[in-house]
Amino acid sequence: MTVINMTDLDLAGKRVFIRADLNVPVSDGKVTSDARITASIPTIRHALDAKARVMVTSHLGRPEEGVYSEENSLQPVADVLADKLGQPVRLIKDWVDGGFEVAEGEVVLLENCRFNKGEKKNAEETARKYAALCDVFVMDAFGTAHRAEASTYGVAQYAPVAAAGLLLVGELDALGKALCEPARPMVAIVGGSKVSTKLTVLESLAEKVDQLVVGGGIANTFLKAAGKPIGRSLSEDDLVPTAQCLMEKMAKRGAAVPIAVDVVCGKQFDANEPAVLKSAEDVADDDMIFDIGPESAKQLAEIILNAGTVVWNGPVGVFEFDQFGEGTKTIADAIAKTKAFTLAGGGDTIAAIQKYDIYDKVSYISTAGGAFLEFLEGKKLPAVEILEQRAKG
């Protein structure tokens, strides 16, 4: 995967347009989690240190195109950026047609790009206007790399130079290391409520990994496919044959989907619901499975500790409720201890990593959700493809 790395360019005095992923949660005009902003700082800092004239934009939320809305304004982000960079960050509202100056070593934040007409549809006119603002376009928003929009794809077509930022390069290197040249054994942990939303990921990983660990609602469908009772647990009956087929396919090449031997149940989905440990054979008709049991968790921890590569996307239980979080905690602890290259991504996964305090013990944490999944599926990401094309000249 060959792209131009921004660190290989002379940026002094150049107008550098950075598409970052600053789509952070905002409440009452304040950013409530600044992880994505923090992840974008090295790229912005590199451009500033190189004495570039720096412009940064991002989307935030899902505003109506062509309409300004205060609730989706990047002003709260500008405040956090200024604080983290230790210098003022002007927010520029109507920027598409230019008309503003940026000094060397200055950074401005260009208001939410989704306020602009033609952004989402990747309109050529909009993309060309973006490109006219800069000498160098830097794509650093891996989180939106799976979308071909004016600020992720179109501008890269028309800008004089199109390069990848530090965060994007880091994401691509980590994902490439985990998926293209994995140290064996390779283990993938895929959690989530529905098989249907992660079916292509499961099918793609089933061809690559040595152990495919399934968790959450997805695991219930696999439990059913393995002939185990699941009571009233969330599952997708129409996908039971698909789950059986995946397990058979993996078994044929000596790989496996480990099936839980014990589970933690409740009668209803509630923060105060008592947790009851049961053998996977003894789930009652009115039970709901909310976590894996300690024996299953121990087996999975052993698999993780002996792995060469671990890809983690999704918890294995309802970890938001502590009584149903022990399975995910055991997995997190094993990921923290293993000598394997560990790659984690997805909102729920990052929440679990933060809850169990293993952030600095994971080899690489992807900031992306959808793009991370599409990469796992083996799909080409449009925003990366255009950077590859531009690198060829």
UniProtKB/Swiss-Prot annotation:
InterPro entries named in the record: Phosphoglycerate_kinase (IPR001576), Phosphoglycerate_kinase_CS (IPR015911), Phosphoglycerate_kinase_N (IPR015824), Phosphoglycerate_kinase_sf (IPR036043)
Superkingdom of the organism of origin: Bacteria
Involved pathway(s): Carbohydrate degradation; glycolysis; pyruvate from D-glyceraldehyde 3-phosphate: step 2/5
Catalytic activity, reaction form: (2R)-3-phosphoglycerate + ATP = (2R)-3-phospho-glyceroyl phosphate + ADP
A UniProt-annotated Pfam family: PGK
Protein residues bound to ATP: 198, 320, 346-349
GO BP term, example: gluconeogenesis
Main location: cytoplasm
Residues binding substrate: 21-23, 36, 59-62, 114, 147
EC number, as in UniProt: 2.7.2.3
Subcellular location: Cytoplasm
Top EC category: transferase
Gene Ontology terms, MF aspect: ADP binding; ATP binding; phosphoglycerate kinase activity
Keyword terms of this UniProt record: ATP-binding, Cytoplasm, Glycolysis, Kinase, Nucleotide-binding, Transferase
Assembly and oligomerization: Monomer.
Name the record gives this protein: Phosphoglycerate kinase
